[in-house]
Each structure stands twice: as C-alpha cells, then as structure tokens.
Amino acid sequence: MSEQYSNDFKLNAAMAAIVLSGGVIGYAKSKSMPSLIAGSVFGLLYSTSAYYLSQGNSKVGLGVSVLASSLLGGVMGKKAIATSKPIPIILATGSAFTLLSSGKELYNIHKN
C-alpha cells in the first residue's frame, strides 16, 4: 500500500465498519430492513475503496470513496435535517469528511 494513501485507507476502512455495524444495529433494534440494506451496501462500497487503496489502485479506490461518500452524505444529510437525530448527523458528517479527504487526493492525482 502506498504510504501516501494510508490515511484514506484507514478512513474508508473505519467508515465501512461504522456504516455496516450501524445497519446491523438499526436492524437489531427496530427490525429496519432499509438500515440493514443501506449499511451493507455502503459498508461494501467503503470496503471496496479500502481494498483498492491497499492494492495501490488509488484512482479507483478514491473514486469509489467519493461516490460512496456523496451518496451517503446526501441521504443522511437530508435525514439529519428532517429529524435532527444524532446518527444521521454523525453519518453525514463522517461522509462529508471522507468526501473531502478522498476528493482532495483524487483531485491531486488528476491535476498532476
């Protein structure tokens, strides 16, 4: 793995764990299939991003991260505004941070 992208790898791996566990917890607490499905899908996207970053394919890894973060941020941002509940706010903030980090690195790759 490139040392340059190790922080992005860690961030995407952490987001994968957070959203996947959140989906499982949401299902366990309230039998929410949408939480389980969304947690699984976004967990898979962030895991895919982390995998590609660990293999040195930074363009694909960062691209998948930007995609996942944009989608999750949009969905959770809308939900955070509507409900003011802490979980959507945390997920929207985390995805925004991941989007900024991965987007900046992806921009730098394409700029050079």
UniProtKB/Swiss-Prot annotation:
Q: Which GO terms describe its cellular component?
A: mitochondrial membrane
Location in or out of the cell: Membrane
Q: Where are the transmembrane segments?
A: 9-26, 36-53, 60-77, 87-109
Cystines in this chain: none
* Gene Ontology BP term (one): regulation of heme biosynthetic process
Top-level taxon: Eukaryota
| Main location group | membrane
Write the record's keywords in alphabetical order, separated by commas. Answer: Membrane, Transmembrane, Transmembrane helix
- Topology of this chain in the membrane: Multi-pass membrane protein
InterPro entries listed in its UniProt record: TMEM14, TMEM14_sf
Q: Family, per the entry?
A: Belongs to the TMEM14 family.
What the entry lists under PANTHER family is as follows: TRANSMEMBRANE PROTEIN 14 HOMOLOG (PTHR12668:SF52), TRANSMEMBRANE PROTEIN 14, 15 (PTHR12668)
Name the UniProt record assigns to this protein: Transmembrane protein 14 homolog
Q: Which organism encodes this protein?
A: Dictyostelium discoideum (Social amoeba)
| Lineage, highest ranks first | Eukaryota, Amoebozoa, Evosea, Eumycetozoa, Dictyostelia
